Amino acid sequence: VKSTLAALLLLCLTAAASAEETAIGFRSSTLPDAQDNRPLQMVVWYPAATAATPELIADNPVFVGARGAPDAPPAAGEHPLVVLSHGYGGNWGNQVWLASALARQGYIVAAVNHPGTTSKDRSPQAAAQLWQRPKDLSRAIDAVLAQPTQFGAVAKQRIAAVGHSVGGWTVMEIAGARFDPVLFARDCDIHPKLGGCIGYKQMNPAGTPVGKAELVKDLSDKRVTAVVSLDLGLSRGFTDASLAALPVPALVIAGGVPTEDMSPELESADMVRRMPKASTQYVEIGDATHFSFMAICKPGGMALIEEDSPGDGMICRDGEGGRPRESIQQQVVELITAFLAHTGS
C-alpha cells in the first residue's frame, strides 16, 4: 500500500511540476472598431512554443498576479478558446488566476475591459450600452481567430465564454438568453436591494427607446459552444422561453454566502430552475462570496483598498471560517476544466 501511495504522490508531484513548467505567453492589444467609438483593450494568455522568461502580470500592492511570458511565440497546433468577461467596475486583471490556469491546460484565453463598466473606463455613456458587452466578446473571438501567428490557432468547434457577475449575464446573452427590460424593472421593484438592480439603475441601459430596443435583441454568437457563469447578476431579466431553449451547455457556479445585495437563491439558482436540465450543471460553493471569484488579495491589500475607497475592502473577504481564496479558486478551475472537457468545449 505504501508503495502505491508513494507512486501516486510522485505522479501528482510530477503533474504539478509539469503544469508549472508549461510555457504561457501573454499579449496585450487594443481593438479598434469601425466607428472608432468603442476601442477595446484585450489581453490574451496562450500556450507558448518555448519556455520564455515569464513575468508577473497584473501583480500590484493589493492583488496577486500570475506569470506569463510577454509576446512569446505561440505553440503549434490548434487550441480551444475561452473568452472572459469581468464584472461591473472590474477589469481583465480580476480573473488572471483563471486565465493563466486555463492557458496552462492548453487553452487560449482572451479577456477584455468592457468600456463603461471597467475600472479603467467608467463613462456613463458607454456603461449605458449594456448590450455591447456580448458584442465585445464576439469582437475578441474575431481578433483571436484572425491572428494565429500572435496567439496560436483556434480549434473553432471549441469556443467557450466565462463571466463573473454582470460578466455572467454577458456570457448567458452570448449563449442565447434574451433579456426583457420591462420584466427586469418590474422585478427590481420587488427586489430593489439586489446588486444587479442597483448596478442596472446606475447604468440605465433602457433609459432611451434605442437602448430598450437593443437590449431585447438576440445577442448570441453561434460560434460559442459552452458557457460558464460565476455568481452572475441581472439573471432575473432573462425570459423563461429563452432560458428553456438555451442551445449550449452551461455551468452555473454560485457563491453560497448570501448578502443583502447578492443571493444565489434569487440569481443563479433561480436561473438554473428555468434552464434545460440535461445540459445545465449547477454548483453552489458554500464558503465562497461574490468576490471569491476575483484575484487573491495580498496581506494588507484590504487596508489599502479601504484607504482609497472606504467600504470596498469587502472584496477581499471570503466566507467566514471557510477556506482561503486560493483553495476556492482551485475548486473553480477544476469544475470549469472538467465541464469544458466533458462538453468538448
Residue ranges and their predicted role:
Residues C12-A17:
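N-terminal signal peptide c-region/cleavage motif recognized by signal peptidases
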Residues E20-L84, R104, P264, G301:
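Domain-level recognition of soluble alpha/beta enzyme cores
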Residues A23, A245-R325:
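Active-site-adjacent alpha-helix of alpha/beta-hydrolase-fold enzymes
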Residues A49-G68, A185-T239, P258-M262:
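Mobile cap/lid helix-loop segments that gate and shape the active-site cleft of serine hydrolases
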Residues A58-V62, G89, G93-W97, N113-K135, ...:
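Cap/lid segment of the alpha/beta-hydrolase catalytic domain
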Residues A66-H79, L84-R122, R236, P258-M262:
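Short substrate-entry loop that stabilizes the transition state in hydrolases
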Residues A126-G152, K156, W169, E173, ...:
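Alpha/beta-hydrolase active-site loop
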Residues A161-G163:
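Short beta-strand immediately N-terminal to the catalytic nucleophile in serine-hydrolase-like folds
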